[in-house]
Structures are given as structure tokens and as C-alpha cells.
From Swiss-Prot:
Protein name (Swiss-Prot/TrEMBL): Protoheme IX farnesyltransferase
Record family assignment: Belongs to the UbiA prenyltransferase family. Protoheme IX farnesyltransferase subfamily.
Catalytic activity from the UniProt record: heme b + (2E,6E)-farnesyl diphosphate + H2O = Fe(II)-heme o + diphosphate
Pathways per UniProt: Porphyrin-containing compound metabolism; heme O biosynthesis; heme O from protoheme: step 1/1
Assigned EC number: 2.5.1.141
CDD domains: PT_UbiA_Cox10
Phylogenetic classification of the source organism: Bacteria, Pseudomonadati, Pseudomonadota, Betaproteobacteria, Nitrosomonadales
Transmembrane feature ranges: 26-46, 52-72, 93-113, 120-140, 148-168, 174-194, 219-239, 241-261, 278-298
BP GO terms, sorted: heme O biosynthetic process
Note: Carbon 2 of the heme B porphyrin ring is defined according to the Fischer nomenclature.
Chain's role: Converts heme B (protoheme IX) to heme O by substitution of the vinyl group on carbon 2 of heme B porphyrin ring with a hydroxyethyl farnesyl side group.
Keywords: Cell inner membrane, Cell membrane, Heme biosynthesis, Membrane, Transferase, Transmembrane, Transmembrane helix
GO molecular function: protoheme IX farnesyltransferase activity
Length: 298
């Protein structure tokens, strides 16, 4: 192996570690809902400049928020089985490097949104960053078992950001998209917390199963799933969406409710794991249904 090829491999490996700091699998779902918000905001095509700069800008700031989350929690991550392989606990990147990286990509993302999208989107995205990386990660997460419920507001913002990127305003329909993700967040994360309870207990994180027990958490998964099922019908009831969406969401909700019932009545870690994975697919499919219905409304 030549010196140049070795240097290239090392550089590529370093880039991959910084990329991992952005939690690409999580961010991809966030950005997907933001892009769908862009398309839902207009009856026709999204202006190409808004689509490109809005998507890239939101992606960069979301990646910076994820990197700050990794930075704040890296000592906890080193203890938890699910997260001990992340770059910071493994020593693949340093704390100063992570801080520099997140400031760089976050700052450039905000600059891009301000200059080439609109100031409203930039300020909303900055507020979302602060809500997730500071208010949720630093303050709420180690303080209260309701961290997911309260902090879920920041996680529900991406479709609103996408909407604002194209229209320069926030409409009632955009807030409906926010409400869907806000209602989705508790059953999604509590399913994870149930089968990862031991990990959270190790680090003293007050997740709901740790502070209130499994039965209480399972009940709340069911209750919030019912709320979600009601909320997700609202786009049809408000005539934002039509029958394609309604048919799709009723099927998706029925499956989600099935998992919630199983978690409540016949809990196993495997069921909770399956429910968590389904909840990710659920959100992606629901927003896909919104998009398809938007252009083929009847």
C-alpha cells in the first residue's frame, strides 16, 4: 500500500467518524419530513432553489444538533450498550474537534438558510436547534421523565421548517404536521426506553420506565398511541388531505395500535423492539401518503 493511498484511507475514516456524529439515520427521517413539508406547502412544484438550499441547510443544522447531543452525552454513551460504539466514547474524535465540527456545519447551515431561503426559516431552525440540543438534551432529559413529551416539540418542527422555507410563513396545515410528529414521539421513544431500561438505569437517566415502572409506561404507550390515531385523521377532517391519505393512515394506525395493545397486555422486549422499528417506518409511510395524496387528491 502506498503512502498516498494509506493517507486517503485514514482521511476517509476520519470523515466517516464525523459523519457518524450527525446521526445520519435519525437526521434522514427528520429531513424527509421537512422535504415533505415543502411539497405540501404549494399546489405545484417546489422552487428548486428553496428545495436545495432548504434541504441542505436544515440537514446541516440537524446534524449539528445531533453532534452536540453526542458531545453532551458521550460519558453516558460510553456506559450504554446501544451507544458505546459512537465516535466520542471510542476516542475516534475529540471533544474540541466535535465542538469545532458542529459549530462549522451548524453555522454554515444557518447562514445558508438566511441568505438563500428566508430569515424566518433560519430563526425557526435555530430555535429548533436550541430546543433539541440545549433545552431537551441538557436540561429536560436528565431532569424529568416527561422529557420526551416536552422535548418532543423540537423534534416535531421539521415539516414546519420545510413549509416556511417555501412559503415564508406558518399555516394551520403546517401546524397539523407538527402535531402529528408531536403525538408520535412519546410512544416511539417509550417503546425504546422499555427494552433499554437497564441502560438508562445505569446512567441515572429518568426515563419513564426507570422512574415509574414498566406497567405505567406501557399504559402511556397505549394512551399516546390512541391520541396519535386521533390526531393523524385530522388532515382528512380539515380537508388538507383526501381519501388516499385516509385509507393509508387508517391501516398504519391499526398496525401501530396493534403493537401498543401487545405492549400493554403481552409485553416482551422483542415486542417493544418491533414496535419501535415499526414506528419509524410508520412516520415515513404516513408522510409519503400525505405527499401522494397531495398530488393525486380525490
Amino acid at each position: 500500500m502506498t503512502t498516498s493511498s494509506l493517507a486517503w484511507q485514514q482521511a476517509t475514516a476520519r470523515v466517516q467518524q464525523f459523519y457518524r456524529l450527525t446521526k445520519p439515520r435519525v437526521v434522514s427521517l427528520i429531513v424527509f419530513t421537512a422535504v415533505i413539508g415543502m411539497f405540501l406547502s404549494v399546489p405545484g412544484a417546489v422552487p428548486l432553489d428553496k428545495l436545495i438550499f432548504g434541504t441542505v441547510g436544515i440537514s446541516l443544522v440537524a446534524g449539528a444538533a445531533a453532534a452536540l447531543n453526542c458531545l453532551v452525552e458521550y460519558k453516558f454513551d460510553a456506559i450504554m450498550a446501544r451507544t458505546k460504539g459512537r465516535p466520542l466514547p471510542q476516542g475516534k474524535v475529540s471533544v474540541p474537534e466535535t465542538l469545532f465540527f458542529l459549530v462549522l456545519i451548524g453555522g454554515f447551515g444557518l447562514f445558508m438558510l438566511h441568505q438563500w431561503v428566508n430569515p424566518l426559516t433560519m430563526w425557526l431552525t435555530l430555535g429548533t436547534f436550541v430546543g433539541y440540543a440545549i433545552i431537551y438534551t441538557v436540561i429536560l432529559k436528565p431532569l424529568t421523565p416527561q422529557n420526551i413529551v416536552i422535548g418532543g416539540a423540537s423534534g416535531a418542527m421539521p415539516p414546519v421548517l420545510g413549509w416556511a422555507a417555501v412559503t415564508g410563513e406558518i399555516s394551520a396545515d403546517a401546524l397539523l404536521l407538527f402535531l402529528i410528529i408531536f403525538a408520535w414521539t412519546p410512544p416511539h421513544f417509550w417503546a425504546l426506553a422499555l427494552y433499554r431500561k437497564t441502560d438508562y438505569a445505569k446512567i441515572g437517566m429518568p426515563m419513564l420506565p426507570v422512574t415509574h415502572g414498566d406497567e405505567f409506561t406501557r399504559l402511556h404507550v397505549l394512551l399516546y398511541t390512541i391520541i396519535l390515531c386521533v390526531v393523524t385523521v385530522l388532515p382528512y377532517l380539515t380537508q388538507m388531505s383526501g381519501l388516499i391519505y385516509l385509507g393509508s393512515v387508517l391501516i398504519l394506525d391499526a398496525i401501530f395500535f396493534y403493537y401498543a395493545i401487545r405492549i400493554y397486555l403481552h409485553y416482551t422486549d422483542q415486542i417493544a423492539r418491533e414496535a419501535f422499528r415499526y414506528s419509524i417506518a410508520y412516520l415515513a409511510l404516513l408522510f409519503t401518503a400525505l405527499l401522494v395524496d397531495h398530488y393525486f387528491y380525490f
